[in-house]
Amino acid sequence: MEPSSLELPADTVQRIAAELKCHPTDERVALHLDEEDKLRHFRECFYIPKIQDLPPVDLSLVNKDENAIYFLGNSLGLQPKMVKTYLEEELDKWAKIAAYGHEVGKRPWITGDESIVGLMKDIVGANEKEIALMNALTVNLHLLMLSFFKPTPKRYKILLEAKAFPSDHYAIESQLQLHGLNIEESMRMIKPREGEETLRIEDILEVIEKEGDSIAVILFSGVHFYTGQHFNIPAITKAGQAKGCYVGFDLAHAVGNVELYLHDWGVDFACWCSYKYLNAGAGGIAGAFIHEKHAHTIKPALVGWFGHELSTRFKMDNKLQLIPGVCGFRISNPPILLVCSLHASLEIFKQATMKALRKKSVLLTGYLEYLIKHNYGKDKAATKKPVVNIITPSHVEERGCQLTITFSVPNKDVFQELEKRGVVCDKRNPNGIRVAPVPLYNSFHDVYKFTNLLTSILDSAETKN
């Protein structure tokens, strides 16, 4: 379970197989990896859906009492078991003491968000004063863009990756429209090279170098929602700032997935949601980051009561005393029930640590990649077997836990057959199925079972064809 820092996941799998005197695809390898996994007990902190409860399942094909193979934490994380307890604490407080709950208890409602910010700082690599928990991701993105995007006649572009997540795309379009700018001229999108699925860092840096003088803001994903590509955040940040650009990131698919060091990397601003890898539930409270170097120079364009210093907030004299930095961007009081959900998950992250989770994730996803390539790589095409292509980068530093896979047979059919058998993943246009083994609650045996099911489905498709 503890490969050297120089050992690739495939080498680890093969080494363990040799030690066990079995083939690398043998179930014993998965069981051994789980036995050696020091994080395996964290799975017990989550509710794992039962196969029998999932709507698409065909009960004639499965053991209904088994747990589902849940590989969709990149869309919605599983529920931490402590969520219900924490929600009941606040509901009970509301019932018993009503308005006094604003100021007393484990989570005084007026500072509920602040009570858990300390648990977030190591996940994103920031100081507490650089983080605010508020709103939803796109709302925060708009609030930050209103302050960071100040176009001039010479510097008026926003640089982003082509096929960014639709909400980011729409947000950027509307920000440009707000300033009366021509979208085609001002929205600079970088596309992969012909015949490639992902972006090369050298191509991103070349565009920044050549066009940086006309770019006001660079806004990239930390991890791309479709391809699973993990962008080189420090390199993009350094290059952009060297050309005078502000550099921000949408970390929806990066936070809780890969290690982040936003402060040390000098990132100007960032936003993230909490319902994917952070397991805070659908619509969970989102997060925002502004580097401390901007605390006294970047001000919110839109202000609310909760951006006012708490010490004088209740003077009610309507004389704004703005909190420096990102906390000054807070508009309304924190939704305490959403805080509870996030709190339950962040406590687990605190115990597990991002460094340990990332180490497991590299091996967990690497094991998945190894089994897929062994069974259905491109070199199998000569055998007329269906081919499974992984479009996510193979270098571990260029991806998180997600692999996006395509098939030489209709992916809709493969997806439906996986769902019937209790596998929870998703398909995304144009033709990908996203599979994300999450180190907090997925096991190596989950990966083994998934690839076995995939093999039986594809073998069946081969027979039909």
UniProtKB/Swiss-Prot annotation:
Superkingdom classification of source: Eukaryota
Keyword annotations: Acetylation, Cytoplasm, Disease variant, Hydrolase, Pyridine nucleotide biosynthesis, Pyridoxal phosphate
Regulation: Inhibited by o-methoxybenzoylalanine (OMBA).
Catalyzed reactions per annotation: L-kynurenine + H2O = anthranilate + L-alanine + H(+); 3-hydroxy-L-kynurenine + H2O = 3-hydroxyanthranilate + L-alanine + H(+)
Record InterPro entries: Kynureninase, PyrdxlP-dep_Trfase, PyrdxlP-dep_Trfase_major, PyrdxlP-dep_Trfase_small
Positions that bind pyridoxal 5'-phosphate: L137, T138, F165, P166, S167, D168, S221, D250, H253, Y275, W305, N333
A cellular component annotation (GO) from this entry: cytosol
Tissue expression notes: Expressed in all tissues tested (heart, brain placenta, lung, liver, skeletal muscle, kidney and pancreas). Highest levels found in placenta, liver and lung. Expressed in all brain regions.
Pathway annotation from the record: Amino-acid degradation; L-kynurenine degradation; L-alanine and anthranilate from L-kynurenine: step 1/1; Cofactor biosynthesis; NAD(+) biosynthesis; quinolinate from L-kynurenine: step 2/3
N6-(pyridoxal phosphate)lysine found at: K276
Inducing stimuli: Increased levels in several cerebral and systemic inflammatory conditions.
Gene Ontology MF term list: kynureninase activity; protein homodimerization activity; pyridoxal phosphate binding
Pfam family, one: KYNU_C
Sequence similarity: Belongs to the kynureninase family.
Subunit structure comment from the entry: Homodimer.
Associated disorder: Hydroxykynureninuria: An inborn error of amino acid metabolism characterized by massive urinary excretion of large amounts of kynurenine, 3-hydroxykynurenine and xanthurenic acid. Affected individuals manifest renal tubular dysfunction, metabolic acidosis, psychomotor retardation, non-progressive encephalopathy, and muscular hypertonia.
Name of the protein in its database record: Kynureninase
Native species: Homo sapiens
Encoding gene per record: KYNU
